[in-house]
Amino acid sequence: MKLGWLEAAALTAASVASAQVKQDDLPVSPPYYPSPWSNGEGEWAEAYNRAVQIVSQMTLDEKVNLTTGTGMSEKCVGQTGSVPRLGINSICLQDGPLGIRFTDYNSAFPAGVNVAATWDRQLAYIRGHAMGQEFSDKGIDVQLGPAAGPLGRFPDGGRNWEGFSPDPVLSGVLFAETIKGIQDAGVIATAKHYLLNEQEHFRQVPEANGYGYNITETLSENVDDKTLHELYLWPFADAVRAGVGAIMCSYQHLNNTQACQNSHLLNKLLKAELGFQGFVMSDWSATHSGVGSALAGMDMTMPGDIAFNDGLSYYGPNLTISVLNGTVPQWRVDDMAVRVMAAFYKVGRDRLATPPNFSSWTRAEKGYEHASIDGGAYGTVNEFVDVQQDHASLIRRVGADSIVLLKNEGSLPLTGKERNVAILGEDAGSNPYGANGCDDRGCAQGTLAMGWGSGTANFPYLVTPEQAIQQEVLKGRGNVFAVTDNWALDKVNKTASESTVSLVFVNAGAGEGFISVDGNEGDRKNLTLWKNGENLIKAAASNCNNTIVVIHSVGAVLVDQFYEHPNVTAILWAGLPGQESGNSLVDVLYGRVNPNGKSPFTWGKTREAYGAPLLTEANNGNGAPQTDHTEGVFIDYRHFDRTNQTPIYEFGHGLSYTTFKYSNLTVQKLNAPAYSPASGQTKAAPTFGTIGEAEDYVFPDSITRVREFIYPWINSTDLKESSGDPNYGWDDEDYIPEGAKDGSPQDVLPSGGGAGGNPRLYDDLFRITAIIKNTGPVAGTEVPQLYVSLGGPNEPKVVLRGFDKLVIQPGEERVFTTTLTRRDLSNWDMEKDDWVITSYPKKVFVGSSSRKLPLRASLPAVQ
């Protein structure tokens, strides 16, 4: 056993040095050191002070315990060590962004992409709060969600559905509201994946090797700082302003440095510029060095071990050694511990925390304390605590409000008096193996209600479209017949020909890269419908002149083969609606809910219409595959506008059972202070308590070592022997980046100075109003959208900058009011390393989508 610990040379000079070696012709990520220390500014003050008080009482091994997962053998997918002397239990971290993974008696909420389709701030908050309640009641301290990485660079990116939208403003608003909801329920939210987790191919070396790709390093996302700030970083700035407690760094490289040891990404952008006060954790097995990651700003390694269940760690005892020998300064490990505890106190977790009442690894009531080794005490591991409350009604509401009515030729809403209703397509029915019959939902059976991977939850039940529609039809004493075999086209033809309305269900899934479904290695291999979907629709439409298509998908699909068919009278996108799938759908089909979803992405005519494909072939030998963001900020609707392409359905599009008229646009300039770059210096890095000597941290004789469990203690007072590192003793100058250990006061970045960046960025410069009138016969909900032209020759034609959701009665007028901040009107200047408002003339547009903008006005110049 001791040999295994000695082999954990995780914080070695060699590992840090090798992380700095890059080929000369590849993009590089500039270094930024030291790692900024938290200061408890703003709403973090009380939590920070409490964290400082408790960390000041900790010994080094106790601080290290807070930074290191104990491996994959405990109840949660991630658990830190504990500090029992001070009454601090291990911190439980659990997936995922749409509900609790690996448990029971929990809810399966609609996916993030569905929340984006609601364009509803309040609903995003309520959903977040409901999820937070469930996590808290299961004894979970940290929810591993929500996600805004991936943002959605590619329409076929595997995990886009976990996030919200490829538009940074829409994503940022809903990201922030979800975080607020989770944390107001007393659980730490995790903003992930930071940053550029835009595709599944090549995100992990073992995973890629398993698919036959010969690589030794993960994908490098090569991107300039303008694109980072104006697109991918934008939602994370909103998350920081929302007070998010944790941020998860991603598997990918940014400009050829691993995200979890990328000082530009973590130290500069996140902590120095955005003023993040919480802690940075690694994605699972995304830690590739110890000293390198610690000095670059990563505060917690998860799940703690290097490879699952190997008992070795880049932190743990190696972090203890590195602090004892001065490789990692005391102030840095103190800051790591303070950040963890500050997040814990900020959400009030100390008042709510209870031990986990479930096991991630078995549904049995009884089991071993340490599941992976069948070791430790044997007893109750699952208490089967029902945490669902009344969340089913909320899930149904989100599902209904997220349905986007793409096309309607008058066939909807249904009356309930249809005599013969055909339900066609496998996507209408049940998975023959059960709703949870495939691990992490990794299959293509039955109706699609979530994607696959770690971002899933177990269904407590799943109401299928077939079940819900049949109930509706029978209420009206009609006939209903279902064919749920997509390949039985002869049966489809016959059933459709005998129906007064044919409801055709099709889908397309995607998910995390560790699962491949029908050759889709996480990412989709194309944008077509699955399982003969196009032919299914055409067969039905050829035999029924009232064919309604319902699409359950992770994002855009190609509809070019059927959207103009004269017998396809309506098309609805229902996304990934969660457990109430069928019920939320019938609410819209039968008019109980007037459809009010708006598409959070663009529907192109071909895959090529979206621009470059995601990378599926290694292009750098066996080194890190390289993907260059040559498109800059031009993704989704920005790309379509730039290339003068007309999409089938544009970003923001969504029909209603009523109509709306826009008028009376007004622009009011507000009094706001002039922009001034932040200046001054931070205080010196504080230290809390003392470190002691090596003999204080030798593995205690009183502790029985558990195989695979990660401890903070060392094996010997001889630090070189304890490290097992053949390169132990290198001089700092040989491998420690310049300034990385400097705890003296540091200059404040011009773009920094507050949560989310320079506080002046968030000053309101203009108030925009418009009148929206319901000109139809029924009450409806409209989403007015504000777009801005920033005016520059190399800028997008328009960018979304505001929206609202208004319930409007027939004949009623409502006023849409929003503001434009300095950030909304700024561009990132890479020379000044700051935001600037250019001198180009700027315009505002208001309408119902990115292509339907009837109102426009020029903005007065602003400094």
Curated annotation (Swiss-Prot):
Entry's Gene Ontology BP terms: cellulose catabolic process; glucan catabolic process
Alphabetized PANTHER family for the sequence: BETA-GLUCOSIDASE, BETA-GLUCOSIDASE A-RELATED
Keywords attached to this entry: Carbohydrate metabolism, Cellulose degradation, Glycoprotein, Glycosidase, Hydrolase, Polysaccharide degradation, Secreted, Signal
UniProt GO cellular component terms: extracellular region
Chain positions covered by the region annotation Disordered: 720-754
Highest taxon in the source lineage: Eukaryota
One example GO MF annotation: beta-glucosidase activity
Signal peptide: 1-19
Function summary: Beta-glucosidases are one of a number of cellulolytic enzymes involved in the degradation of cellulosic biomass. Catalyzes the last step releasing glucose from the inhibitory cellobiose.
One Pfam family of this chain: Glyco_hydro_3
Family, as annotated: Belongs to the glycosyl hydrolase 3 family.
Sites where a glycan is attached: N65, N214, N255, N318, N325, N357, N493, N526, N545, N567, N664, N715
Species of the source: Emericella nidulans (strain FGSC A4 / ATCC 38163 / CBS 112.46 / NRRL 194 / M139) (Aspergillus nidulans)
Major localisation: secreted
PROSITE patterns per the UniProt record, alphabetical: GLYCOSYL_HYDROL_F3
Name recorded for this polypeptide: Probable beta-glucosidase A
Subcellular location: Secreted
Assigned EC number: 3.2.1.21
Active site: residue positions: D283
Pathway the protein takes part in: Glycan metabolism; cellulose degradation
Chain segments annotated as transmembrane: none
Reactions performed catalytically: Hydrolysis of terminal, non-reducing beta-D-glucosyl residues with release of beta-D-glucose
